[in-house]
Amino acid sequence: MDTTGTGQRGASIVVVDYGLGNLRSVTRGLERASADVSIVGDPGALDDADGIVLPGVGAFGDGMENAGPFRDALTDAADEGRPLFGICLGMQMLLSSSEEADHEGQGDARGLDLIPGRNVRFTGTVKVPHMGWNELAVTRDHPLVGGVDGEYAYFVHSYYAAPDDPGHVVAETDYGERFPAVVANDAGNVFGTQFHPEKSGATGLRILRNFVDYCADQ
């Protein structure tokens, strides 16, 4: 795979620190992709960013509770057309709700509802969590996934995003069933990966470079 994407310098990217997420590894990955990166814990710091990354590891209900102070700032940024990139739990938080909150006894935790849909648990006999490398099958064009069709990325998750509109699915992966690995809204500026690009070697670096280039072009 060609990983020589430029990652245009000058794109200002903020990584949202809401208490859950691989902040350092995500930041290092973005720096390798030539971004100017800051980790921010203040919602007001999102205002001047070219792009926003919402990372996340853990339970949906906890994520939404911790990220509560950022809800309005994230929604405003998305409405303004600025790029918002959710990673793993961060991607799931872009949706409307999750079965996980119900299973954890947290009730109906509300997501950001930037991509209508619900996160659901794997069914059948597959081992959960889905952990390890798996293949990406791109289903529609989006700047984030240029050059990664058929490549492998690293996953760790028990739930996955199920958008109401199948047109919001950008790439799929097979783990006993086909599930969305990358999703995006209609406008294309809000998107997420179920896998961890910062842990996905050359494939992940290509995706992060695609993201930085997209932010620089806006």
Curated annotation (Swiss-Prot):
Assigned keywords, A-Z: Amino-acid biosynthesis, Cytoplasm, Glutamine amidotransferase, Histidine biosynthesis, Hydrolase, Lyase
Catalysed conversion reaction: 5-[(5-phospho-1-deoxy-D-ribulos-1-ylimino)methylamino]-1-(5-phospho-beta-D-ribosyl)imidazole-4-carboxamide + L-glutamine = D-erythro-1-(imidazol-4-yl)glycerol 3-phosphate + 5-amino-1-(5-phospho-beta-D-ribosyl)imidazole-4-carboxamide + L-glutamate + H(+); L-glutamine + H2O = L-glutamate + NH4(+)
GO MF, one annotated term: imidazoleglycerol-phosphate synthase activity
Pathway info: Amino-acid biosynthesis; L-histidine biosynthesis; L-histidine from 5-phospho-alpha-D-ribose 1-diphosphate: step 5/9
NCBIfam families attached to this UniProt entry: IMP_synth_hisH (TIGR01855)
Encoding gene (name): hisH
GO BP annotations, alphabetical order: L-histidine biosynthetic process
Record's subcellular location: Cytoplasm
Domain of life per record: Archaea
InterPro entries documented for this protein: Class_I_gatase-like, GATASE, Imidazole-glycPsynth_HisH
Protein name: Imidazole glycerol phosphate synthase subunit HisH
